A protein has these predicted regions:
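Structured alpha/beta or helical-core interaction and ligand-binding surfaces enriched in interleaved
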Residues: 1-103, 107-157
Length: 157
Protein backbone atom coordinates (compact mmCIF):
# COMPACT_ATOMS: atom_id res chain seq x y z
CA UNK A 1 0.00 0.00 0.00
CA UNK A 2 1.05 3.58 -0.24
CA UNK A 3 1.55 6.66 1.88
CA UNK A 4 0.74 9.47 -0.57
CA UNK A 5 -1.43 10.36 -3.51
CA UNK A 6 0.96 10.21 -6.43
CA UNK A 7 0.27 11.11 -10.03
CA UNK A 8 1.37 7.58 -10.96
CA UNK A 9 -1.24 6.03 -8.63
CA UNK A 10 -3.92 8.32 -10.04
CA UNK A 11 -2.94 7.40 -13.59
CA UNK A 12 -2.59 3.67 -12.89
CA UNK A 13 -5.96 3.38 -11.15
CA UNK A 14 -7.87 5.74 -13.46
CA UNK A 15 -9.21 7.81 -10.58
CA UNK A 16 -9.55 11.57 -10.23
CA UNK A 17 -8.55 13.98 -7.45
CA UNK A 18 -10.13 17.10 -6.00
CA UNK A 19 -8.77 19.52 -3.40
CA UNK A 20 -10.85 20.99 -0.60
CA UNK A 21 -10.17 23.52 2.12
CA UNK A 22 -9.97 22.00 5.57
CA UNK A 23 -8.45 23.71 8.58
CA UNK A 24 -8.68 20.43 10.50
CA UNK A 25 -8.93 16.87 9.23
CA UNK A 26 -12.72 16.73 9.58
CA UNK A 27 -14.89 19.84 9.93
CA UNK A 28 -18.55 20.17 10.93
CA UNK A 29 -20.51 17.14 9.72
CA UNK A 30 -17.70 15.63 7.64
CA UNK A 31 -17.47 12.47 9.75
CA UNK A 32 -20.92 11.53 8.46
CA UNK A 33 -20.16 12.67 4.90
CA UNK A 34 -16.94 10.65 4.71
CA UNK A 35 -18.41 7.59 6.42
CA UNK A 36 -21.39 7.59 4.06
CA UNK A 37 -19.19 8.06 0.98
CA UNK A 38 -16.78 5.26 1.88
CA UNK A 39 -19.61 2.90 2.89
CA UNK A 40 -21.51 3.49 -0.36
CA UNK A 41 -18.60 3.51 -2.80
CA UNK A 42 -15.91 1.41 -1.12
CA UNK A 43 -17.39 -1.01 1.39
CA UNK A 44 -14.86 -2.88 3.46
CA UNK A 45 -11.96 -1.96 5.64
CA UNK A 46 -10.32 1.46 5.72
CA UNK A 47 -6.65 2.09 6.41
CA UNK A 48 -4.99 5.19 7.81
CA UNK A 49 -1.26 5.62 7.23
CA UNK A 50 0.79 8.43 8.75
CA UNK A 51 3.04 10.27 6.33
CA UNK A 52 5.30 11.40 9.16
CA UNK A 53 7.84 9.90 11.48
CA UNK A 54 6.07 8.96 14.68
CA UNK A 55 7.53 8.66 18.16
CA UNK A 56 8.35 5.14 19.40
CA UNK A 57 5.24 3.38 20.62
CA UNK A 58 2.87 5.30 18.33
CA UNK A 59 1.05 3.47 15.58
CA UNK A 60 2.14 4.26 12.06
CA UNK A 61 -0.95 2.65 10.55
CA UNK A 62 -4.53 2.06 11.68
CA UNK A 63 -7.19 -0.22 10.20
CA UNK A 64 -10.93 -0.11 10.82
CA UNK A 65 -13.40 -2.78 9.76
CA UNK A 66 -16.20 -0.40 8.79
CA UNK A 67 -16.40 3.25 7.91
CA UNK A 68 -18.56 4.67 10.66
CA UNK A 69 -18.56 8.18 12.07
CA UNK A 70 -17.09 6.88 15.34
CA UNK A 71 -14.29 4.99 13.58
CA UNK A 72 -13.36 8.05 11.50
CA UNK A 73 -13.31 10.19 14.62
CA UNK A 74 -10.90 7.71 16.25
CA UNK A 75 -8.64 7.84 13.18
CA UNK A 76 -8.68 11.65 13.30
CA UNK A 77 -7.69 11.54 16.98
CA UNK A 78 -4.91 9.03 16.25
CA UNK A 79 -3.41 11.25 13.53
CA UNK A 80 -4.28 14.64 15.04
CA UNK A 81 -2.20 17.43 13.51
CA UNK A 82 -0.40 15.15 11.05
CA UNK A 83 -0.37 14.37 7.38
CA UNK A 84 -2.08 11.05 6.84
CA UNK A 85 -3.64 9.03 4.07
CA UNK A 86 -7.00 7.33 4.53
CA UNK A 87 -7.80 4.76 1.85
CA UNK A 88 -10.13 1.91 1.03
CA UNK A 89 -9.19 -1.75 0.93
CA UNK A 90 -9.26 -1.73 -2.88
CA UNK A 91 -6.95 1.35 -2.85
CA UNK A 92 -9.18 3.21 -5.33
CA UNK A 93 -10.73 5.65 -2.84
CA UNK A 94 -8.44 7.86 -0.77
CA UNK A 95 -8.17 11.09 1.16
CA UNK A 96 -4.87 12.79 1.91
CA UNK A 97 -5.22 14.99 4.98
CA UNK A 98 -2.56 17.70 5.22
CA UNK A 99 -1.35 20.25 7.74
CA UNK A 100 -1.63 22.93 5.06
CA UNK A 101 -5.36 23.61 5.59
CA UNK A 102 -6.54 21.41 2.74
CA UNK A 103 -7.19 17.80 1.83
CA UNK A 104 -7.08 15.87 -1.44
CA UNK A 105 -9.93 13.47 -2.13
CA UNK A 106 -9.35 10.88 -4.87
CA UNK A 107 -11.39 8.12 -6.38
CA UNK A 108 -13.81 7.29 -9.16
CA UNK A 109 -16.22 10.07 -10.15
CA UNK A 110 -19.20 8.69 -8.16
CA UNK A 111 -17.05 8.89 -5.01
CA UNK A 112 -16.03 12.49 -5.73
CA UNK A 113 -19.62 13.50 -6.48
CA UNK A 114 -20.60 12.43 -2.96
CA UNK A 115 -18.42 15.29 -1.71
CA UNK A 116 -18.76 17.78 -4.56
CA UNK A 117 -21.96 17.79 -6.63
CA UNK A 118 -20.38 20.41 -8.93
CA UNK A 119 -16.71 19.57 -9.50
CA UNK A 120 -15.96 22.72 -11.51
CA UNK A 121 -17.44 24.91 -8.77
CA UNK A 122 -15.28 23.09 -6.21
CA UNK A 123 -12.16 23.72 -8.28
CA UNK A 124 -13.02 27.44 -8.49
CA UNK A 125 -13.69 27.54 -4.74
CA UNK A 126 -10.34 25.92 -3.96
CA UNK A 127 -8.48 28.30 -6.30
CA UNK A 128 -10.12 31.23 -4.47
CA UNK A 129 -8.98 29.71 -1.16
CA UNK A 130 -5.43 29.25 -2.52
CA UNK A 131 -5.29 32.83 -3.80
CA UNK A 132 -6.53 34.18 -0.47
CA UNK A 133 -3.97 32.11 1.45
CA UNK A 134 -1.18 33.32 -0.83
CA UNK A 135 -2.23 36.96 -0.36
CA UNK A 136 -0.94 36.72 3.23
CA UNK A 137 2.74 36.39 4.15
CA UNK A 138 3.67 32.77 3.48
CA UNK A 139 6.62 30.49 2.89
CA UNK A 140 7.67 29.07 -0.47
CA UNK A 141 6.59 25.65 0.85
CA UNK A 142 2.97 26.82 1.34
CA UNK A 143 2.88 28.21 -2.18
CA UNK A 144 4.32 25.00 -3.60
CA UNK A 145 1.84 22.67 -1.88
CA UNK A 146 -1.20 24.82 -2.72
CA UNK A 147 -0.16 25.14 -6.37
CA UNK A 148 0.42 21.38 -6.48
CA UNK A 149 -3.06 20.77 -5.04
CA UNK A 150 -4.57 22.83 -7.86
CA UNK A 151 -2.60 20.83 -10.44
CA UNK A 152 -4.24 17.63 -9.17
CA UNK A 153 -7.48 19.08 -10.59
CA UNK A 154 -6.09 19.83 -14.08
CA UNK A 155 -8.16 16.95 -15.48
CA UNK A 156 -11.21 19.25 -15.23
CA UNK A 157 -9.79 21.71 -17.81
Amino acid sequence: SQRALSRKWISDTGVFAMAAEGIVHFVDDEYKLFADAFRAEAPGRLFGISNEDRPPGWDHAVMVEQSTEDELEQIAIEFFGQYFLLFSEDERHAVLFTQADYKLIAGPLPFLHRFFPDLSAQKREFIEFKNEELSYPHTAWVELVLENAVRFMDWLD
